[in-house]
Amino acid sequence: MRNEYPRPDFIREKWMPLNGTWNFQDGTDKTPVKIQVPFPPQSRLSGFQKELTSDRITYQRNFFIPAEWIGQRILLHFGAVDYKCSVFINDHCVGFHEGGQSSFTFDITDFLSGGEETLTVAVTDYLHDETVPRGKQFWKSSGEFIWYTQSSGIWQSVWLEPVNEAHLEWIHFTPDIDQGTVEITYSLSDCTVFPCELEWDIRFKDHPVSHGSLTVSEKRGKIIVDIFKNKALRGSFHFTGWYWSPEHPNLFTVSALLKSRNILLDQVETYFGMRKVHVHGGRVYLNNQPYYQKLLLDQGYWKDGLVTAPSEENYIQDIQKAKEMGFNGCRKHEKAEDPLFLYWADKLGFLVWESTASFWSFSPQSAAVFSQEWTRTIQRDYNHPCIILWNMMNESWGVPRLYDNTQQQHFARSLYHLAHGLDPSRLVIANDGWEMTENDICAFHSYKHGSLDNPDTQAAFSLGLQSLSGLENLVERPLFADRFVYEGQPVMLTEAGGISLKTGKDKKSWGYSDTDSEESFLAAYSHVIRSIYASDLLCGFCYTQLSDIQQEQNGLLDEDHQFKTDPKKIKAINDSRETTTSFSTIEDY
């Protein structure tokens, strides 16, 4: 059962998990069966593990509100439900949500009976509709190629939480390492009676950093807190021990208290990292230093849970294994990952390019829903220092005419500006892979690395990585959309490899190229990575991929997320690039 605290970046002491056994109905089935939430009904861990017969499914369970919660407002939280749902308490509709990747909350207080309560979630997931965001979920009955089994309904945690009428809705932290400050923005509930006091206590490794309070007279506001205490020379060489990075994932813990006349109304435990990311001269900088990204494509699938990890420990192990192989981050692919993963990426030190599920057929309605999902995702995940980039779209999915269609180009550009408007502290890629409009990184995909028995193709791959003109020969479509050109952005190969190590167990499995032994796999892997390292044009890469997924058997881990080869050998290849390499300036190209 998934009963870990589901929102570790915004913790309240009192809460109640609603994960576990629920009643479940597929379509018009009259007799409910048992299902384990939050695992999708198509997964083994759900206990149902069947292909759905209908777009409509229903969940139901009973619960009691603890006696000590009486008199408070009761919030019902959903981590994510795919695709849209209506929520009922005791047959009264308390709210509706559309969007399979985003979290949502309803205040259910006024619908409670005071006894045994009945919670019903009526879900609609359009199994074959290509206009709704679906990511890698195939619209046919079974997975093929790079498409996987569908994951419908509740797929992240459900829980209850008591709060006073006056409480904190959210807190955002925006660090500024150049000034040594953090900007704290906040929002209070609509029922808050003003004036009241907002108090904060910031600590670093249990050492006090800042303690203060502010009289609040409006629902929303901001505070600037001096973290480095106005000390001289706040630059890179004096406060790096306080910065967040994959090598040193330093976090500041925060207690935020809302009070009225010295009466505690709300208390939240949270955290932030002092971290800066920007681009300059064709390079990506982390904390004002050039930083070479060695990323893994991570699609967040598990054999038994599909898009839902079997446990919190699975997130920890994935990050630890990736770091053990010499990677410093991941590009999340077609999925807004569970906040628990982001928490452990913060704690363990692991860069994240955040994503969400794409739709496939363009329409203004699809574009509106997709934009709304991104708005919610950025709002929810804003505080995670591990996230350095919002990766809005992939390979023109959902915008198939992006190259020359003005409307679709406007949409791609609108996503870029939406993300920067909501969050100026991170990088943004509107479209990853090719047909770029406005991107902070020139991010291209190529699997034309060749095979060990085709040295000419291997040589062409290595040569193509040396120049912008050479990249055009390595991608499936033009690098830039019509009327858009390269403007000096950092250049990264953000999908490459996908090499399969075939063991003969499953002839239907595939990769972008095949090997038949650990020795041949390591030779092929080394060719890809060393070709990347030989290019002064590139400032990072993303290798496909972390783990095998169903028929796509091209991961560095198998479908059980265990090593397929010696991780020390992978790390030796990844570490073969000299960290002291001096970058050429982009003007050289």
Regions found by a protein language model. Give the residues of each.
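Secreted/periplasmic carbohydrate-active enzymes, especially glycoside hydrolases
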Residues: 1-332, 344, 373, 386-389, ...
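Substrate-binding/catalytic cleft of secreted carbohydrate-active enzymes
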Residues: 329-561, 569-574, 582-588
